[in-house]
Amino acid sequence: RILGPAFSILFLVWFLSGLVMIYHTFPRADRADKRAKMDILSLENLPSLDQIEKRLPQNERISHVTLNSYLGQTVFHIRTEKGSYDIPADSTERLPVIDWNRIQRVASQWNTSSIAKVDSLYTLDQWIPFGRLKEEFPIYKFHFADPERHELYISSKSGEVLQYTDKNSRFWAWLGAIPHWVYFTSLRQDAELWIKVVVWLSGIGCVMCIAGIYLGIRDFRLARRRHLISPYKKFWYKWHHILGVLFGLFVLTFCFSGMMSLARVQ
């Protein structure tokens, strides 16, 4: 009676937004998009890994390596136990300076439409709500004057594209991913707080479902003494009771799995 009215609205939003997410998720500039903008790699004159390792600080061994070519420069992205390094394949080259000209070149790779305006962001917004991105400030937000109203976010520190959206993906995110994942900027930028809120909401929902299932089964047992299926005689009341218990089991698994997806357990 206490939790039901409030949490029924929350569950309704979760279910409906989950249906939307089958077809539309949170917009992002994913790896496939980024790869499509890269140059084709040439295998000629590439140094060996032994040569690259010699250009690392002493006593550091390569644990992971990625090689790509972008805007005319081939770079090894190296991870070791002590840190990460970006090393040009050509030892005579240096890594590019991330200046405004390079930022514009990156933007033109993603969208050739005219630019309506560019914002310099020093706070996170709805489409980059992740706290780790604060390290990239200022972030340049390009607004393109195309029919799809694309928006592109580029880091001023690395020159990397952080997000790419259009009006369609933003619209569906408001109906799907944002309410379903509780992706509100003020909450999501604090990852620890966001996890706690989702876990607590799911946990309280589990308690509510267990209580409802218990009471529903108890009423079934009481009704059996009078040779009835349900103690409720009115058609809608009776079927609300029966379907409520059955659907409550489903809602319980939904809440519990949502809670465990973020809960830190051994």
Positions of PLM-derived features:
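Conserved histidines in hydrophobic membrane contexts and catalytic metal-binding motifs
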Residues: 1-266
